[in-house]
Amino acid sequence: MKVILTKDVEGWGTIGDIIDVKRGFARNYLIPKGFALEATESHIKHVQEILKQKARKLEREKAKAEEIAKQLEGLEIEIKKSVGTTGKLFGSVTTSDIAEVLKEKGIEVEKKKIMLRNPIKNIGSYNITIRLHPQVSATIKVHVTPENI
């Protein structure tokens, strides 16, 4: 029986693939679970339309990410924190702090898109990568300075 996949099914294929499976597997598992539809002309057109919509959405998201990346590229921000006598920060600079400063500058970035392995705990300048889209990223410079200067 030929079916068209509506979701990615490990070992069988991805969305939009037309595969040939045993009738029982299709009727008892793939179709009831929403993984596939019988490969009729109308179902094929329906799934192809869904794929086109997803492609357009991904293209819009990429264009928006590229626009934000242009604003971010080369941007330098300063974050002031309380510092002890050894030059270590009381607390640390996290992705939330960076996202907040960017928001104040009018650039909305989700904190999970800021690639910071570990919180910053020392004074200095750091290059931080922001991954806006799987294919689009930008680098900003973050200057961490003492609050009392």
UniProtKB/Swiss-Prot annotation:
Name of the protein this chain belongs to: Large ribosomal subunit protein bL9
UniProt keyword Ribosomal protein present: yes
InterPro entries (alphabetical): Ribosomal_bL9, Ribosomal_bL9/RNase_H1_N, Ribosomal_bL9_bac/chp, Ribosomal_bL9_C, Ribosomal_bL9_C_sf, Ribosomal_bL9_N, Ribosomal_bL9_N_sf
Entry annotated with the keyword Ribosomal protein: yes
Keywords: Ribonucleoprotein, Ribosomal protein, RNA-binding, rRNA-binding
GO biological process: translation
Record gene name: rplI
Family named by the database record: Belongs to the bacterial ribosomal protein bL9 family.
A molecular-function term among this protein's GO annotations: rRNA binding
Superkingdom of origin organism: Bacteria
Alphabetized SUPFAM superfamilies for the sequence: L9 N-domain-like, Ribosomal protein L9 C-domain
Function: Binds to the 23S rRNA.
GO CC annotation: ribonucleoprotein complex; ribosome
